[in-house]
């Protein structure tokens, strides 16, 4: 009799995203199987953070004890992981569901496993994972690409975690991921630039952050309530280009901050 169950999930790559999803799934009743990272020490650390699972410092056939395998490695590693897993499992992959968490890559990154009969797909939670605490997943979009059972399992995971599954076609994934990058890390780049400007004119970093946070919060609240166009303020929105020229002249004194 097979030990496989679709409520047991193996995690390959237990960094910020892998740990957060595994911990949340465990809290919702899923069994955590093999947890695979690059070393035994990090695997044990991940299992402690997740609150369950079996640590492995190398790729192992034990992932096949799960019905669902989640690959949460960096994007550049996903194809290599798929190749190694295919070699390890052979025909035992038939009927398994394998998902990766990349926002930019589609299910073709898992082609070696698909060729062996696994149902493959991508499931990307559109959320930021800082590694501190468990991120809020309630209401978060889980962007899903794949077919058949892979898409069904991805939807089930998203709904289990209180997320909103969103289907996306293959060709749209890179542009989708670019949008998310503009909304989070690039946004923080702008905030950091504003912080550095204030530090240049005498603020401490702590004071600069305290000064900027109310502005940032209100801007996001306005965006949530009115949308970007109606929330847009400042000299460009007013057509006050003489003020913009003064901004440019002031910032030209510190070109290294904007290179």
List each model region and its residues.
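NAD(P)+-binding Rossmann beta1-loop-alpha1 motif at the extreme N-terminus of oxidoreductases
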Residues: 1-61
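Short, well-ordered alpha-helices that flank and scaffold nucleotide-derived cofactor binding pockets
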Residues: 19, 23-27, 48, 83, ...
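Short, hydrophobic beta-strand segments that form beta-sheet elements in well-ordered domains
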Residues: 34-37, 98-101, 142-145
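Internal alpha-helical scaffold of NAD(P)-dependent oxidoreductase catalytic cores
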Residues: 44-49, 113, 134-225, 255
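Rossmann-like NAD(P)(H) cofactor-binding subdomain of soluble oxidoreductases
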Residues: 54-133
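Interdomain hinge/lid region at the active-site interface
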Residues: 221-259
